């Protein structure tokens, strides 16, 4: 009613009682916000900032550690590759040494077999020559006896004649 009684009031200017109540309500709202809400918001904001910055620092630390581990693994891999190449080269050298040993043993065995074969051939040749001398001598004496018509029974004479004849053949064959 009070408002209706005052009919000549300017609508642009507020009523002073509303202005006082609004100011008190606003001041009370600002006080509650500053006293209770803002500290909690600041605490939550700071916790969020710390979490983000801490997460970034942890991520950077994890990245640095991962890079360090990667470098260690690469160094170990290079070391393992070098060791594998050395082992491979050692194995090749050992294999070549074994190969050379086997070849040397095979050559020695081959030379031994050839020498034994030559010795056996010389022995057989000597035996055959001796047998042939005896046989040829006997045949020659028998044939000469038939041609001459008398027996050449004298063993010493016969052996001397045969040996001279065969030596003459050998020296003629050697020329």
Curated annotation (Swiss-Prot):
Disulphides: none
SUPFAM superfamilies xref list: F1F0 ATP synthase subunit B, membrane domain
UniProt keyword list: ATP synthesis, Cell membrane, CF(0), Hydrogen ion transport, Ion transport, Membrane, Transmembrane, Transmembrane helix, Transport
GO cellular component: plasma membrane; proton-transporting ATP synthase complex
GO molecular function term, any single one: proton-transporting ATPase activity, rotational mechanism
Membrane topology, as annotated: Single-pass membrane protein
Transmembrane segments: 19-39
Stored Gene3D superfamilies: F1F0 ATP synthase subunit B, membrane domain
Subcellular location: Cell membrane
Matches recorded under NCBIfam families: ATP_synt_b, PRK05759.1-3
Record-linked HAMAP family: ATP_synth_b_bprime
Function: F(1)F(0) ATP synthase produces ATP from ADP in the presence of a proton or sodium gradient. F-type ATPases consist of two structural domains, F(1) containing the extramembraneous catalytic core and F(0) containing the membrane proton channel, linked together by a central stalk and a peripheral stalk. During catalysis, ATP synthesis in the catalytic domain of F(1) is coupled via a rotary mechanism of the central stalk subunits to proton translocation.
Subunit structure: F-type ATPases have 2 components, F(1) - the catalytic core - and F(0) - the membrane proton channel. F(1) has five subunits: alpha(3), beta(3), gamma(1), delta(1), epsilon(1). F(0) has three main subunits: a(1), b(2) and c(10-14). The alpha and beta chains form an alternating ring which encloses part of the gamma chain. F(1) is attached to F(0) by a central stalk formed by the gamma and epsilon chains, while a peripheral stalk is formed by the delta and b chains.
Family: Belongs to the ATPase B chain family.
Listed name of the protein: ATP synthase subunit b
Organism (species): Salinispora tropica (strain ATCC BAA-916 / DSM 44818 / JCM 13857 / NBRC 105044 / CNB-440)
């Amino acid at each position: 009613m009070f408002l209706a009684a005052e009919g000549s009031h300017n609508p642009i200017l507020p009523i002073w009682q509303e202005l006082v109540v609004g100011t008190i309500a606003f001041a009370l709202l600002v006080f509650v916000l500053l006293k209770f809400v803002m500290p909690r918001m600041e605490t939550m904001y700071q916790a969020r900032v710390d979490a983000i910055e801490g997460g970034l620092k942890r991520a950077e630390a994890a990245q640095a550690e991962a890079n360090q581990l990667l470098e260690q693994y690469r160094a170990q891999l290079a070391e393992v590759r070098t060791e594998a190449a050395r082992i491979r080269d050692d194995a090749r050298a050992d294999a070549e040494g074994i190969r050379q040993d086997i070849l040397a043993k095979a050559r020695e065995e081959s030379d031994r077999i050839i020498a034994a074969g030559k010795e056996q051939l010389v022995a057989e040749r000597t035996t055959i020559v001796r047998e042939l001398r005896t046989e040829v001598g006997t045949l020659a004496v028998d044939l000469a006896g038939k041609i001459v018509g008398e027996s050449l029974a004298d063993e010493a004479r016969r052996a001397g004649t045969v040996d001279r004849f065969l030596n003459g053949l050998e020296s003629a064959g050697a020329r």
